[in-house]
């Protein structure tokens, strides 16, 4: 079996032989994940929390693409996801009451920002293709419940979401000097994966759930 020794900065015109087929050459990557929760007990019946998440990675080579063949030869010199970045922020407010139609409830807001890219180049070509997507997701959830009596309980709520996607794509030729990538030619636009002028999607839903305890069994 053969593998590609190419990278962002290294140019290798031909595949190299993999002496140990049990090792997936040039497919390692690094990833950082941070997670933190905060909780504020306002009083006995009110609670506020905050969920924070962040992750980032190095380039992530896609192994199934790097071993794909065409006419008996490796097809791709490069195929990797660019650094995948994700930020998540979600505050939540909880309340506990003795009202007739509300024993407990919570409101949850969510914001998420995701960014990733796809990069590829064929063997025998100096042209690298770049596709990038940025996604923003907003959401608001409401969940409430109460007991009508000992046998009847209800839960109800809603969810609203809004998603916004922005896509960018271009290609450029690499400038090579002794197997080193020293720069690139001017970028040329290519078709994007999603509408380049931004696209969005929204949804809204409500629900109600009734539990009737017929007997102890």
Positions of predicted regions on the chain:
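Outer-membrane beta-barrel domain signature, especially the mid-to-C-terminal portions
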Residues: 23-25, 63-65, 78, 118-120
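Short, contiguous strand/loop micro-motifs
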Residues: 21-23, 77, 128, 193-194
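Face-selective signature of the C-terminal outer-membrane beta-barrel domain
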Residues: 41-55, 83-217
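C-terminal/domain-terminus segments
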Residues: 52-78
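Flexible, surface-exposed loop regions and adjacent strand-edge segments
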Residues: 2-12, 16, 64-74, 121-130, ...
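Transmembrane beta-barrel wall of Gram-negative outer-membrane proteins
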Residues: 1-59, 85-87
